Regions:
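Peripheral (often C-terminal) accessory segments that flank ATP-dependent C-N-forming ligase machineries
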Residues: 24, 315-406
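Structural motif corresponding to alpha-helix initiation and N-cap regions
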Residues: 80-84, 106, 155, 187, ...
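Short beta-strand-to-turn element immediately C-terminal to the catalytic PLP-Schiff-base lysine
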Residues: 152, 181-186, 214-217, 280, ...
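ATP-binding N-terminal substructure of ATP-dependent carboxylate-amine bond-forming enzymes
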Residues: 22-125, 129-130, 391
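A conserved helix-loop-beta module that forms one wall/lid of the active-site cleft
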Residues: 121-181, 187
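Phosphate-binding core of ATP-grasp and ATP-grasp-like enzymes
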Residues: 194-248, 253-287, 291-299, 311, ...
Length: 406
């Protein structure tokens, strides 16, 4: 028995030495996967926080070495996510790559996919979604309900379509966080339109804006998070706060879920998809847009659901079973936005008071500098009474201010 133990001990020591020498973690007989994320903002940061629970080696590609994700990943590469060679060199030795922003070099991802690197979401779905013109054409081709639209190449084109007003003008590429969107009520607003390729959408009289996060495994299994009801800041065109689950009539709820699944199935890609939907006053539901990644409308799931959207994406990337999307509690999420008139080193006024609030969970994004309208963090409130949670959210909004140090 002693000889057997010594033999087994020697084999175990050799195994440990192998792991150390190769700097690889062996889990269940396989190497730790190397996963890359294109982009290093707050979405990447929260993905990395969730990654700590999994056997994965994380890589970030981002042009800003002081980005929110830089100090949380195993390996950081400073570089342009829109440059073909940079993206290709970053990804060629990785097992799987995902994104935290759509504005990436898809051609490099296509090349990497052809060489065996898993790209989630697929380059083909990303190519469809990243341009709002091709995205709207995708909805039309696949008979997915969406607002009527026209395509414009420049501001001059708008003069030929004044009968289409009131409408929403959306830049084909480059828009984010409320930028790249203009409401054109009549021809006097034409000067606010975009002098670049864009979509002109017929205005829908909106009763509610909702979002449904859809998770798709590599085998095609689908699960949905309950719809979240989004309330936007009219001045910033940014998410102000949201309620989950959304307050919807049952028939609207089922209609919204069916449309979200229909749209994501047509993309034919694994991944996590945030389907933003518009509900009109007659209860009709239209797809506004899809984000093929983790999304602001899913942040509440960190505390509000059994498996967060970030946990869910890692399950998909690493071939684990999909998690439970059931809500733990009703939640209200409030974005923390940089105050108007303040640009510079960020200071959080009222933070101590917010921390005293029961069942309030604060997430700061690690951004050193603030500017008007910049997303600096979010707060999730949990409870059972929606009215009380919304009241708390408004109180916190007035209590907490992100200003620049003097």
């Amino acid at each position: 028995l002693l000889d057997k133990w010594k033999h087994e001990e020697k084999e175990f020591i050799l195994l440990i030495e192998y792991v150390i020498n190769n700097q690889e973690l062996i889990i269940g007989g396989s190497k730790m996967k190397k996963a890359g994320i294109l982009g290093g903002g707050q979405l990447g940061r929260m993905l990395l926080q969730a990654a700590a629970n999994y056997p994965v080696e994380t890589y970030i590609l981002e042009n800003d070495s002081h980005c929110p994700s830089a100090h949380l990943c195993h390996h950081f590469t400073k570089g342009d996510i829109n440059d073909y060679d940079t993206v290709y060199q970053f990804g060629k030795n990785l097992d799987v790559i995902t994104i935290e922003i759509e504005a990436v070099n898809v051609e490099a991802l296509e090349k990497l996919e052809s060489e065996g690197v898993q790209i989630i979401p697929s380059p083909s779905s990303l190519k469809t979604i990243k341009n709002k013109i091709t995205q709207k054409q995708f909805y039309h081709t696949n008979q997915i309900p969406t607002a009527d639209f026209l395509i414009t190449q420049n501001k001059k084109d708008l003069q030929s379509h004044t009968s289409f007003f009131p409408a929403v003008h959306k830049l084909a590429e480059g828009g984010y966080d409320g930028k790249g969107v203009e409401v054109l009520k009549d021809e006097k607003d034409i000067q606010r339109g975009f002098d670049a390729p864009a979509v002109l959408e017929k205005m829908i009289h909106i009763s509610k804006e909702i979002s449904i996060i859809v998770a798709v495994s590599k085998t095609g299994e689908i699960t949905l998070y309950p719809p979240a009801e989004m309330v936007f800041d009219p001045a910033l065109n940014l998410l102000d706060y949201q309620i989950s689950p959304a307050r919807l009539e049952e028939k609207v709820f089922f209609k919204a879920e069916a449309i979200a699944v229909q749209a994501v199935k047509k993309l034919a890609s694994p991944g996590l998809f945030a389907v933003e939907l518009l509900v009109d006053h007659q209860g009709e539901v239209y797809v506004n847009e899809i984000a093929p990644r983790v999304h602001n409308s899913g942040h509440h799931s960190i505390e509000g659901n059994y498996s967060s959207q970030f946990d869910m994406l890692w399950r998909i990337l690493l071939d684990y079973p999909l998690g439970s999307t059931k809500p733990v509690h009703t939640s209200v999420l409030l974005n923390i936005i940089g105050a108007e008139g303040h640009s510079g080193q960020a200071v959080y006024l009222g933070l101590e008071q917010v921390l005293k609030t029961e069942n309030a969970f604060i997430h700061l994004y690690g951004k050193s500098y603030t500017k008007p309208g910049r997303k600096m963090g979010h707060i999730t409130l949990l409870g059972s009474d929606i009215s009380e949670l919304v009241f708390k959210a408004h109180r916190i909004k007035n209590m907490l201010k992100v200003v620049a140090s003097t």
